[in-house]
Amino acid sequence: MMVHNYCAPENVTAPPHVSRVTQYNKRGIRMISKVTWRVAWESDLTNGDHAELSDFFKSVYGATGAFNALPFAGGRSWAGARPELRGIAYDESGVAAHMGVLRRFIKVGGEQIAVAELGLYGVRRDLEGLGIGHSTLAMLPVLKALGVPFAFGCFRNELRIHFQRFCRNGKGAIVDNVNIKSTQPDIYPDLPPTKIEKKAAVILPLTETLDRWPEGVDIERNGPEL
């Protein structure tokens, strides 16, 4: 049986993380942009922060379909479960990238385990080279300080290549065809209260090794997706 000692928020700190990424101006000229990462607890964000993130998500997720931008209306900066912690990248144009984190217990093959769930991935569309790998690398010291054995996140197929690159050399593992059971983010009279989706998931070892991850492809969140 695993024993988990969670860190208090004040024990979780991160040094400034600066990335240099490629952009192109309106003339197609290659430029290098400096991006600075901020790690913020949810209760430290202001209404202005949420409004700025809301606009960011509407732009990023709306590009894949107007329906995907709807959860972020009215200054809302989350779609399902609300993050506990956020990694936010800024450049001279504002929010450049985002990754949300939420500690929770999930069930994997019927076995309960504590994880730091990753979600709300986003990169501004005009940036090139600031992928999920950069986001994960910037957040890794913080994730390791949270006192949970693994980080876990589901992802769309378009993000597979980014996670595959990051997981090289044993940094993590990708599990395909996982059956994820989640609650709906709200009450919908015409829908059941839970849903099951088949997705791919990434597992990152934090305080345990990958061989300690439970076997099984059935995962229960016991809550909405981050």
Swiss-Prot record:
Species for this entry: Azorhizobium caulinodans (strain ATCC 43989 / DSM 5975 / JCM 20966 / LMG 6465 / NBRC 14845 / NCIMB 13405 / ORS 571)
Function: N-acyltransferase required for nodulation. Acts in the production of a small, heat-stable compound (Nod) that stimulates mitosis in various plant protoplasts.
Keywords: Acyltransferase, Cytoplasm, Nodulation, Transferase
Official protein name in the record: Nodulation protein A
Gene Ontology MF terms: acyltransferase activity
Annotated localization: Cytoplasm
GO cellular component annotations of the record: cytosol
Cited InterPro entries: NodA, Nodulation_prot_NodA_CS
Principal subcellular localisation of the protein: cytoplasm
Family: Belongs to the NodA family.
EC number: 2.3.1.-
